[in-house]
Amino acid sequence: MLKVYSPHDLHLIREIPFSKPKEIERSLERAEKLFKDKKNHIPAWKRIEVLEKVVEIMESKRTLLAKLAAEEGGKPLVDSIVEVDRAINGVKIAISYSGVMSGEQIPMGQTMSSQNRLAFTIREPIGVVVSI
């Protein structure tokens, strides 16, 4: 268990269980397997829907999230409210980019060999990400 203490007065805030290495490996393998099968990819409209729900939940629990952040960080509540608002805005920014993350056309026709050719980039996920 990871014990989280308040930096303000060192009281125990919460105990959080660690994942065992095998559990982590299984989770990563499952995530990679799902990722490699393109039919499992979530379309942009659904990702937007999920992120909008995240914003809704965060906004409804804004005070609780701020109190938890203040307690864990040992900082004033007013600073934690700013932190929570910044996190909510970060999700909103992600939503705004979800529909426009497309590729670009690359100018061609600048040499004889590139005449009548089309080149473009596409943006797509490259794999599983792990974060702590």
Question: Where do the protein language model's features map onto the residues?
Answer:
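Substrate-binding/gating loop at the entrance of the active-site cleft, primarily
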Residues: 110-132
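N-terminal Rossmann-like NAD(P)+-binding subdomain of aldehyde/semialdehyde dehydrogenases
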Residues: 1-117
